[in-house]
């Protein structure tokens, strides 16, 4: 979109810095001829201007309010290198098929952000600008982070490859389950659930996001019973096992204390929740790196700002920030389960976690190429309303480098927890075997599972119980550039 000359940036210094109010594009925040530098951070915003607000002016306002501008001209601008410090909106396009919404591309000089700080970057990009009155709504859809800035972050403390080496498990997805019910179990009963799941063939068990240290179960009791279960299951199966011990707490001091105790007990992995905040996440990443412990991130709270398509932050952006911040696992959706997730969009999240270079892929919501500069890869986690009868879909969608977590799909098994774990492990092994033999598991999957169930009573019971269960709702966050195919 091009605007007439009277709306162009004012170059006369006297006029530009005269006291009063100027349009944002006149102050230099709209630069349609700007070519982003390799060292620029580029953000794609979805903006919905108020009625009567020009979309170019709205884009310029986003650039201004997320970098150096305020509502009026200030004389102290002349004490800075304004041309470097101003963010630059350089392109605006209508969102396909959605009247009143626009995509705005905004470039930020690398000098605007503190090295290795997600908190500082987000204070600019999703700070006051999201409350700006001339906008009905704004959403950060995607971000291109320059290699020069990526290199200021340490990234995942363990990474996908080293995690597999530590666990000695290759060529298949990892299996997990969340202990249920989330709240109310005693420490001893909690440990019994963990043992049964791991003994039945799961690689991991897991605390849920809201189990910390409540009156019915102190965190120290849980850790002791859980690690006793992990050690016994490892001895019984000959496999390395783990259970995500949630160290989320009210203060960093409490979190460090819990993490240290988990390490002393021999846990290979600890867990944190997204709600602890970006600074706490980076702090726990540093701890995990120093102590050779895998760091699992539950994305608790993300749906409050990622789910709505017109306002907030896309989860693909959160996934990028978390890879920089340094987590080894992150929940990324299932597409076929109970939680929000369009199949192609969710695949885009997985690409962000696992690629060395994430390529632009508009049908999957990826607007930019992203070079990760050899930053370690994150293991995506699929969790929420999945069961053994969907194994072919999950492997077809997400491949091997994923943790498939069947909480209710393990612990709700009619024959018990261990039987539920057996059902999931057999379903996984038969599907991987069929895939490796060259079979079309997407289409032949149900038949492959039925044949395997002839020799595995727990799998047969799982298919009989949940085989017809699906969550067929229209996702709210879908690609603007492709019709998403069904998951069959």
Curated annotation (Swiss-Prot):
Cofactor, how bound (note): Binds 1 Mg(2+) ion per subunit.
Obligatory cofactor(s): Mg(2+)
PTM sites of type N6-carboxylysine: 206
Top-rank taxon, per record: Bacteria
GO molecular function terms noted in the UniProt entry: magnesium ion binding; monooxygenase activity; ribulose-bisphosphate carboxylase activity
Residues involved in substrate binding: 128, 178, 182, 299, 331, 383
Residues that coordinate or bind Mg(2+): 206, 208-209
Swiss-Prot/TrEMBL GO biological process terms: reductive pentose-phosphate cycle
Listed PROSITE patterns: RUBISCO_LARGE
EC numbers, comma separated: 4.1.1.39
Family recorded in the similarity comment: Belongs to the RuBisCO large chain family. Type I subfamily.
Miscellaneous information on this protein: The basic functional RuBisCO is composed of a large chain homodimer in a 'head-to-tail' conformation. In form I RuBisCO this homodimer is arranged in a barrel-like tetramer with the small subunits forming a tetrameric 'cap' on each end of the 'barrel'.
PANTHER family assigned: RIBULOSE BISPHOSPHATE CARBOXYLASE, RIBULOSE BISPHOSPHATE CARBOXYLASE LARGE CHAIN
Subunit structure, interactors included: Heterohexadecamer of 8 large chains and 8 small chains.
Function according to Swiss-Prot or TrEMBL: RuBisCO catalyzes two reactions: the carboxylation of D-ribulose 1,5-bisphosphate, the primary event in carbon dioxide fixation, as well as the oxidative fragmentation of the pentose substrate. Both reactions occur simultaneously and in competition at the same active site.
Entry protein name: Ribulose bisphosphate carboxylase large chain 1
Organism: Methylibium petroleiphilum (strain ATCC BAA-1232 / LMG 22953 / PM1)
Gene encoding the protein: cbbL1
């Amino acid at each position: 979109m091009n605007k007439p000359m009277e709306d162009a940036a004012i170059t006369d210094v006297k006029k530009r810095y005269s006291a009063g109010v100027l349009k944002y594009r006149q102050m230099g925040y709209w630069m349609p001829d700007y070519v982003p530098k390799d060292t620029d951070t580029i953000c794609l915003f979805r903006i919905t201007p108020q009625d009567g607000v020009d979309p170019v002016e709205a884009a310029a306002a986003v650039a201004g309010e997320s970098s150096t501008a305020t509502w009026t001209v200030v004389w102290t601008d002349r004490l800075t290198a304004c041309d470097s410090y101003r963010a630059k909106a350089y392109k605006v396009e209508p969102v396909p098929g959605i009247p009143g919404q626009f995509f705005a591309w905004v470039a930020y000089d690398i000098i605007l952000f503190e090295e290795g700080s997600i908190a500082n970057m987000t204070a600019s990009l999703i700070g006051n600008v999201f409350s700006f009155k001339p906008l009905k709504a704004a959403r950060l859809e995607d971000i291109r982070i320059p290699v020069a800035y990526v290199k200021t972050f340490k990234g995942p403390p363990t990474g996908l490859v080293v995690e597999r080496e530590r666990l000695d498990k290759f060529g298949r997805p990892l299996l997990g389950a969340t202990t249920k019910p989330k709240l109310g179990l005693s420490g001893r009963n909690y440990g019994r659930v963990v043992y049964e799941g791991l003994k039945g063939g799961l690689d991991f068990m897991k605390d849920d996001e809201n189990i910390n240290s409540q009156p019915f179960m102190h965190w120290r009791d849980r850790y002791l019973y859980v690690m006793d279960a992990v050690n016994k299951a490892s001895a019984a199966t000959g496999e390395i096992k783990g259970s995500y011990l949630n160290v989320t707490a009210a203060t960093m001091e409490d979190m460090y204390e819990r993490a240290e105790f988990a390490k002393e007990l021999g846990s290979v992995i600890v867990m944190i929740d997204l709600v602890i905040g970006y600074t706490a996440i980076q702090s726990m990443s540093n701890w995990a790196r120093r102590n050779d412990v895998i760091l699992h991130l539950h994305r608790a709270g993300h749906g409050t700002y990622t789910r709505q398509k017109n306002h907030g932050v896309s989860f693909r952006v959160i996934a990028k920030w978390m890879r920089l911040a340094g987590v080894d696992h992150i929940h990324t959706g299932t597409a076929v389960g109970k939680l929000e997730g369009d199949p192609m969009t969710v695949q885009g999240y997985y690409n962000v976690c696992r690629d060395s270079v994430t390529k632009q892929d508009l049908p999957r919501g990826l607007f930019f190429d992203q070079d990760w500069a050899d930053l370690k890869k994150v293991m995506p986690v699929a969790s929420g309303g999945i069961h053994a009868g969907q194994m072919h879909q999950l492997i077809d969608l997400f491949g091997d480098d994923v943790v498939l977590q069947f909480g209710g799909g393990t612990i709700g098994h009619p024959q018990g927890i261990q039987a539920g774990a057996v059902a999931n492990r057999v379903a996984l092994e038969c599907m991987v075997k069929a895939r490796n033999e060259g079979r079309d598991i997407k289409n032949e999957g149900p038949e492959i599972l039925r044949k395997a169930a002839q020799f595995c009573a727990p799998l047969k019971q799982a298919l009989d119980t949940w085989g017809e269960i699906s969550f067929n709702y229209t996702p709210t966050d879908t690609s603007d550039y492709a019709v998403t195919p069904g998951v069959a």
